[in-house]
Amino acid sequence: MFGISFSELLLVGLVALLVLGPERLPGAARTAGLWIGRLKRSFNAIKQEVEREIGADEIRRQLHNEHIISLEDEARKMFAQNQHPETTYEPVSPQPASVQPDAANTGHNTLGPAEPAAPKPALSLEKTAKPVDADTPVPTPPVHDSSLPPRAP
């Protein structure tokens, strides 16, 4: 891994035995092994996270490219339809509230005159209107208390 041969490793072990002594050498070797294991696990976790992010970025890039390609294909179809008005255009994906040209007007991209909208019925909270009696008192709004904050308009 680090390019250390067996003889170099044996030399490091001999120096550690002389410096630490025979009582503390097994504990030091165990601690060094634990630290090396933690470093390896941390390195592998970071490497996996980077690979996962690269994979996610690649997937995002691929989806974006596919979306752009589909938009380009749709634009080509629309351009081809403008060049050849006798062919009908079918969109790649359904679009809500899209205006479809009718068969008589496929040669032009202009909208005709707008038709007047149908009159809207009067809005009411009740389903049926009740006739107002002359004896029925007209409801009055409650008097505003001056100790309360003003009402919003």
UniProtKB/Swiss-Prot annotation:
Entry GO terms, CC: TAT protein transport complex
Chain ranges passing through the membrane: 1-21
**Domain of life the protein comes from:** Bacteria
Q: Which GO terms describe its biological process?
A: protein transport by the Tat complex
Q: List the disulfide bonds.
A: none
Q: Which InterPro entries match?
A: TatA/B/E, TatB
* Stretches for region Disordered: 78-153
For membrane topology, the record states:
Single-pass membrane protein
Q: Does the keyword Protein transport apply?
A: yes
Q: Which UniProt keywords apply?
A: Cell inner membrane, Cell membrane, Membrane, Protein transport, Translocation, Transmembrane, Transmembrane helix, Transport
Which Gene Ontology terms cover its molecular function? Answer: protein transmembrane transporter activity
Cell inner membrane among keywords: yes
Primary location recorded for the protein, binned into one broad class: membrane
Where is this protein found?
Cell inner membrane
Q: What Gene3D superfamilies is this protein classified in? A: 1.20.5.3310
Q: Which residues form a coiled coil?
A: none
Q: Which PANTHER family match?
A: SEC-INDEPENDENT PROTEIN TRANSLOCASE PROTEIN TATA, CHLOROPLASTIC (PTHR33162:SF1)
Entry's HAMAP family? TatB (MF_00237)
Q: What does this protein do?
A: Part of the twin-arginine translocation (Tat) system that transports large folded proteins containing a characteristic twin-arginine motif in their signal peptide across membranes. Together with TatC, TatB is part of a receptor directly interacting with Tat signal peptides. TatB may form an oligomeric binding site that transiently accommodates folded Tat precursor proteins before their translocation.
Q: How does it assemble?
A: The Tat system comprises two distinct complexes: a TatABC complex, containing multiple copies of TatA, TatB and TatC subunits, and a separate TatA complex, containing only TatA subunits. Substrates initially bind to the TatABC complex, which probably triggers association of the separate TatA complex to form the active translocon.
Membership in a protein family: Belongs to the TatB family.
Q: What is this protein called?
A: Sec-independent protein translocase protein TatB
Q: Which organism is it from?
A: Pseudomonas savastanoi pv. phaseolicola (strain 1448A / Race 6) (Pseudomonas syringae pv. phaseolicola (strain 1448A / Race 6))
| Source taxonomy | Bacteria, Pseudomonadati, Pseudomonadota, Gammaproteobacteria, Pseudomonadales
